[in-house]
Amino acid sequence: MKLVHGIDIIEWNREELNNPLFAKRILIDNELEYYFQLNSSREKKRYLASVFACKEAVMKALKLKYGYGDILILKTENQRQVYLNKILIKELELSISYTETYIVASVVGLINNMN
């Protein structure tokens, strides 16, 4: 077993967060569907930044080469679940925090070696 941790911080005013093409590069399946259902550009920007930070934190924690399309972040009532290649990774815990300027995502877990 191996303890893993990944963290990512994103500034809200990043220009690419306003770009639907960037959203299509980062988001998949349910994430993309949810994104396009949001009404305001502020909500879209916040959601995209959140998922982007989460996926970056997952990639850093696992230290493996995955694309954004390989990772799905699913928010449930009690937590955010991480799916890797459509398989739930129960060993990872994801936390996210917001300020007026930044979003930070942190992932920790105790996993079997994935190499």
Curated annotation (Swiss-Prot):
According to its UniProt record, this protein's enzyme class is transferase
Q: Tell me its cofactors.
A: Mg(2+)
Q: Which reaction does it catalyse?
A: apo-[ACP] + CoA = holo-[ACP] + adenosine 3',5'-bisphosphate + H(+)
Q: Name one GO biological process term.
A: fatty acid biosynthetic process
Query: What InterPro entries does the record tag this protein with?
Result: 4-PPantetheinyl_Trfase_dom, 4-PPantetheinyl_Trfase_dom_sf, ACPS
Binding-site list for Mg(2+): 8, 56
**Its GO CC terms?**
cytoplasm
**A GO term, aspect molecular function:** magnesium ion binding
Task: Give the Enzyme Commission number.
Answer: 2.7.8.7
What keywords appear on the UniProt entry? Answer: Cytoplasm, Fatty acid biosynthesis, Fatty acid metabolism, Lipid biosynthesis, Lipid metabolism, Magnesium, Metal-binding, Transferase
Q: Where in the cell is it found?
A: Cytoplasm
| Purpose of the protein | Transfers the 4'-phosphopantetheine moiety from coenzyme A to a Ser of acyl-carrier-protein.
Q: Which HAMAP family match?
A: AcpS (MF_00101)
Instruction: Return the similarity comment.
Output: Belongs to the P-Pant transferase superfamily. AcpS family.
Protein's recorded name: Holo-[acyl-carrier-protein] synthase
